[in-house]
Amino acid sequence: GCGKCAALCPQGAVDASTFDVDRSKCTRCGVCASKCYANAKKMAGRKVTLREMMDLIEKDRIFYTNSGGGVTIGGGESTAQHEFVEELLKACRASHIHTAIETCGYGKWDDIKGVFDNTDQVFFDLKAIDTRLHRDLTGAGSELILKNAENAVRNGNEIVFRIPLVPGYNDGR
């Protein structure tokens, strides 16, 4: 690669030798993607307003009503945009639309609590309980995630814990 993305990143989130992006620094500003002549870096998705999102959701209201379903916010990570997601969940609740989020639970509880306060159901992904194994698999320990799982239980959320079993890694073998 040419390295332009690393040189231009205002957060210093792009490693100049590997061109990997440090997601903890990246603000998703798009500078790296907009200046990449080879189109090796691209922005996925688009910005929408709360009203635009609710208009899209309302188009499927009959489906939610007939199926007993609702809106599930996944991603990447639903809590990565916690302010917007919290407002979206509040709007869905005000419109009597059932909501669920999918999360790995990584984030400061003070930041993400509002998301948990305003959703009906949580699909909580636990990659590994053991913090060393979790660090090996994901690059981060499990302490914060387990604490947030505990916080979500105390918060009274309806939770489905999901653990992906990867043969040879976290399947107990």
Regions found by a protein language model. Give the residues of each.
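Conserved AdoMet/S-adenosylmethionine-binding subsite of the radical SAM
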Residues: 51-54, 58-173
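Intrinsic structural disorder
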Residues: 1, 12-14, 126, 148
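Conserved active-site region of classical short-chain dehydrogenase/reductase
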Residues: 3, 30, 82, 86
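Short Cys/His-rich zinc-binding micro-motifs
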Residues: 1, 25-26
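Non-ligating segments of multi-cofactor redox enzymes
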Residues: 1-3, 60
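FAD-binding FR-type
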Residues: 24-25, 46-52
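Iron-sulfur cluster-binding cysteine motifs and their immediate structural context
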Residues: 4-21, 31-46
